[in-house]
Amino acid sequence: MYARIATFEGGDNEKLRQMNEERMQSGEMQPPEGMKRAMVLADPDSNRRLFIAFFDSREQIDAAQERFEQMGDEIPEDVRGRRTSVDVYEVAFENNV
């Protein structure tokens, strides 16, 4: 399992959450092929977010890059924020308690 972690600064957490829910329910926004799950971690004090997307392989992440770029174009920067970095990590282990 691999995780793609994109860091964003600025934007509007509430509008982003609302837009994501609406677009996913309507089918307007499709996640990248191969993405198993995703989560967004937000720090309201610094107005930063981490968007973490999980895939089975590094190759799937590489193949999804174009779709991630399209998703960035579909969401206005004043809502999504400015992407400051993208990193990929192998998931060493996971515990569900």
Model-inferred region functions:
Residues M1-L50, D56-Q70, E77-V97:
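Short S/T/G/P-rich N-terminal loop/turn motif that feeds into the first structured element of a domain
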